[in-house]
Regions:
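Active-site neighborhood of glycoside hydrolase catalytic domains
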Residues: 1-21
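Beta-rich accessory regions
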Residues: 12, 19-238
């Protein structure tokens, strides 16, 4: 996405806007045409099409094209815009699973942490590692990855092995401007999409993938040692 937030001050008398901060709205592979609205309780909500013209517009065998992102609440804090899933999503939380202070070395899975329609928060509270990856929509053949590469100060989202058309855009690499030792990722996983809200919505990554729904495993991969807290809810719409 090339859509940007411009934060600053506006002088009504001179009709001049003074730019103070510029930030990307979404760093993922599929994000287009965002719009905002204001709710009755004065929240600013953003919605957009989760699709890119560089991606496969219409999945083979399907009668739909792209999808909408989950509506996001926008807030300004310390001169920057933070994004978070609308709070109403919590009304659809079911089957909560929690783990605290779990050690991740190599490849790990946790009982109850799987699925294709869910809301999961991962806190990396400590440890010593160069790379940490969360693989979703996974089976023996397919997976989509979100990676923190601390030694390169870089974030990556990679759907190369999701079963997508090979010539489509598959990897997005983003420089982490404020490297840190503690990370918080909130991942909204839908049947054919993933939205990652990094560090309370300082950065957001949206991507589609068209992996078979039978691929529902989630793995955590660390090249050193990481201490993580996990909280996961299925999203169930009656």
């Amino acid at each position: 996405s090339n859509t940007m937030f411009l934060i600053g001050t506006y002088d009504k008398e001179t009709m001049q806007f003074t730019r103070e901060c510029v930030q990307c709205v979404d760093y993922g592979l599929d994000f287009y045409a965002p719009q905002t609205m204001q709710t009755e309780d004065d929240r600013r909500i953003l919605i957009a099409w989760m699709q890119s013209w560089d991606s496969n517009i219409r999945p083979e065998g399907q009668k739909w094209s792209g999808m909408m992102i989950l509506p996001r609440e926008l807030k300004v804090k310390d001169g920057k815009i933070l994004q978070s899933p609308v709070r109403e999503i919590e009304n659809y939380h079911r089957n909560g699973v929690r783990y605290e202070k779990q050690e991740v070395q190599g490849t790990c899975r946790f009982d109850g942490i799987k699925g294709r329609v869910l809301d999961m928060t991962v806190e990396i509270a400590g440890g010593d590692f160069r790379e940490f990856t969360i693989s979703v929509a996974q089976n023996e053949q397919f997976h989509t990855d979100f990676s923190i590469l601390q030694h390169k100060n870089r974030i990556e989202i990679d759907r190369t092995y999701s079963g997508m058309v090979r010539d489509a855009n598959a990897i997005r690499r983003v420089k982490e401007k404020s490297p840190c030792k503690k990370w918080k990722l909130r991942i909204i996983l839908d049947k054919y999409s993933m939205e990652v809200f990094l560090n309370d919505g300082q950065q957001v990554f949206s991507t589609t993938f068209y992996t078979s729904l039978e691929a529902d495993q989630i793995s955590f991969v660390c090249d050193g040692k990481a201490i993580v807290n996990l909280e996961k809810y299925d999203i169930v719409v009656a």
